[in-house]
A protein has these predicted regions:
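Active-site catalytic motif of lipid deacylating hydrolases and related acyltransferases
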Residues: 3-77, 125, 131-133
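A conserved mid-domain beta-alpha-beta active-site/ligand-binding segment of alpha/beta enzyme cores
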Residues: 151-207, 216
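Short aromatic-enriched loop/helix-cap "lid" or pocket-rim segments at secondary-structure transitions
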Residues: 24-26, 114-119, 211-216
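Serine-dependent carboxylesterase/thioesterase catalytic core
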Residues: 15, 43, 59-173
Length: 296
């Protein structure tokens, strides 16, 4: 074991919508946790409500961080959030900056998701289509909760409406008005890296024909799903990962926003079946070294 990724503070990994720690033997952060631990990092994947508002998830995460600080003796944590997990960790850092050394958004909808806007418009919650979609998401969340062998805490609440609104452009705009730390002042720009003693970083990917749809993604159904979802985008058409737009993902120092990775690839899903051009696990390993070099 090397110490190249041995950060000063623990790395706490927070999943997105319908996230989990480990489904039976299948981890959300496929290959990522092992790679970071091989480099000497203390890595703790956590669970919050799979389907709920970013604020509710954030309050759950605050409680979990307090446990981690108590158990490890650390003064702070480095938070890394994928998708809605990015909004969740931003909430925590805004509320309790004294507990957080850094916030890293990985494909986070920091200005909302055009996919969520499309679903809100075409599947209103009080229509039959909306209720069917709501029921399907509830069912998936329930099944995944039963199968998640990586979490053994109390049953976490589910609120599909709150979760959906938290991901729309309007919902995130309201969120950003309350928790603006690290946001760019101009569309497509970079935000301040250091706010209230917390360092902010982000990276994301885009669908790139000839790269993101090649390699092992040719047998990964999630890539097809992302390509279908990408058709719902207008403002960032051709500049998204299927669920989150390139510029919408920006937060703090933007490490990269155009990796040839779809929304699942960026956390090495599914089963490490990703396209050509970049190794998503390497991005996490390099970032841990970056945090270590910054004294975090």
């Amino acid at each position: 074991m090397t110490q190249e990724q041995a950060t000063r503070y623990p790395l706490v990994l927070v999943p997105g919508l319908l996230g989990f720690v480990r489904l039976v033997i299948y981890p959300y952060w496929f290959g990522i946790v092992k790679a970071l631990r091989r480099g000497g990092a203390t890595v703790i994947p956590v669970m919050v409500s799979a389907v709920n508002s970013s604020e509710v998830r954030g309050e759950q995460l605050i409680d979990r961080i307090r446990e981690i600080l108590r158990d490890t003796g650390a003064e702070k944590v480095n938070l890394i959030g994928h998708s809605q997990g990015a909004l969740t960790i931003r909430y925590v850092a805004a509320k309790h900056p004294e507990m957080v050394a850094s916030v890293t958004s990985v494909a986070g909808p920091n200005h909302g998701s055009e996919l969520a806007d499309f679903l809100e418009k075409n599947f209103p919650m009080h229509t039959l289509r909306g209720m069917l979609l709501n029921g399907l998401i509830r069912l998936l969340a329930s099944i995944m909760a039963v199968l998640d062998t990586g979490y053994r805490g109390t049953r976490l609440p589910t609120d599909v409406d709150a979760s959906h609104h938290s991901l729309t452009t309007a919902g995130v705009e309201l969120f950003n008005s309350q928790y603006p730390q690290g946001l760019p002042k101009t569309w497509g720009g970079q935000g301040e890296e250091l706010v209230n003693g917390v360092r902010y970083y982000s990276w994301s990917g885009t669908l790139q024909p000839g790269l993101s749809d090649k390699g092992r993604n040719r047998i990964d159904g999630t890539n097809v799903t992302c390509r279908i979802f990408a058709r719902t985008f207008t403002k960032e058409r051709g500049q998204c990962d299927g669920m989150v737009g390139r510029f919408s993902s920006h937060l703090g120092t933007v490490i990269g926003d155009n990796y040839p990775l779809d929304h699942f690839d960026i956390v090495n899903q599914s089963l490490g079946l990703v396209g050509k051009g970049v190794d998503p696990v390497k991005l996490f390993v390099e970032h841990a070294a970056r945090l270590k070099a910054a004294g975090l």
